[in-house]
């Protein structure tokens, strides 16, 4: 009985998370559609690449608490390679767009519930830039 209730709660949570992510992708697509250019290099982003150009600042697989937060992304082209550069903080922090990531993080950072070294490293890099 307890297992059935737990499974049903997990199922409802998963459905809610999917709805939130669907809304997130739709919002990101609307932002990109208004100005479909990579925020780092300025390359054009075709409509078929909008989702691939949506680069989470804090990876959605690790930071589920902010995976669907409307501030937790940058527009970085996949074809130009800028999205890939954001996967490692040592390269991400050297990008022109990193200060934008910091500003966006300031709008949702307190909502992060996970403890992970990525968060403290991001904050360290951000502190170096903002000092």
Stretch-by-stretch model annotation:
Residues 48-57, 86-94:
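Short Cys/His-rich "knuckle" micro-motifs
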Residues 46, 60, 82-83:
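Short, charged/polar surface micro-motifs in flexible loops or helix N-caps
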Residues 1-37, 64-67:
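Short, charged surface segments at domain edges that flank catalytic/cofactor-binding sites
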Residues 100-131:
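Short flanking/linker segments adjacent to small metal-binding domains or redox-active Cys/His motifs
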Residues 73-97:
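Short Cys/His-centered divalent metal-binding micro-motifs
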Residues 58-72:
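Short linker/helix segments within small regulatory modules
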Residues 70, 90-95, 100-109:
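Aromatic- and Lys/Arg-enriched surface recognition patch
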Residues 20-53, 77-79:
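Short cysteine-rich loop/turn motifs with clustered Cys
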